[in-house]
Curated annotation (Swiss-Prot):
Keywords: Cytoplasm, Fatty acid biosynthesis, Fatty acid metabolism, Lipid biosynthesis, Lipid metabolism, Magnesium, Metal-binding, Transferase. This is Holo-[acyl-carrier-protein] synthase. Its cofactor is Mg(2+). It holds the Pfam family ACPS. Mg(2+) binds at D8, E57. It comes from Rhizobium etli (strain CIAT 652). The lineage of its organism: Bacteria, Pseudomonadati, Pseudomonadota, Alphaproteobacteria, Hyphomicrobiales.
């Protein structure tokens, strides 16, 4: 069953300006080490960071909290499955909120799609509760 849906659309130029103005202070505050390593390898760094930023916003909306109630930027990280498909890994306050949303006997599956078409980046998150037996 679907227990959360969130989406976000961001102007990549905002992220470009934040990187130019604040550099590592911005990237280290908002992104996990895995996200930074992946984005810093890209020719289009700002697009990569913008997609991940949008994913975090979308995930926080799917959790129903936004970036509040103990949910922080680095509590949500974009990772790729072995197939290359992106998903989210939650820790800290985000993981606590997610656990509180799950019905007894269920585990979470977080579905994520991210895309960009300059100057915009978009993310869509669906949080699904699946029976632990599956």
């Amino acid at each position: 069953m679907i227990i959360g849906i969130g989406s976000d659309l961001i102007d990549i130029r905002r992220v470009e300006k934040s990187i130019e103005r604040f550099g590592e202070r911005f990237t280290h505050r908002c992104f996990t080490e895995i996200e930074r390593a992946r984005s810093d390898r890209r020719a289009n760094r700002a697009e990569s960071y913008a997609k991940r930023f949008a994913a975090k916003e979308a995930c926080s909306k799917a959790l129903g909290t936004g970036l509040a109630q103990g949910v922080f930027w680095k509590d949500m990280g974009v990772v790729n499955l072995p197939s290359g498909k992106p998903t989210m890994v939650l820790s800290g306050g985000a993981a606590v909120i997610l656990e509180s949303m799950l019905p007894a006997g269920h585990r979470a599956a977080i579905h994520l799609t991210i895309t960009d078409d300059y100057p915009l980046a978009q993310a869509f998150v669906i949080i699904e509760a699946l029976p632990e037996s599956l």
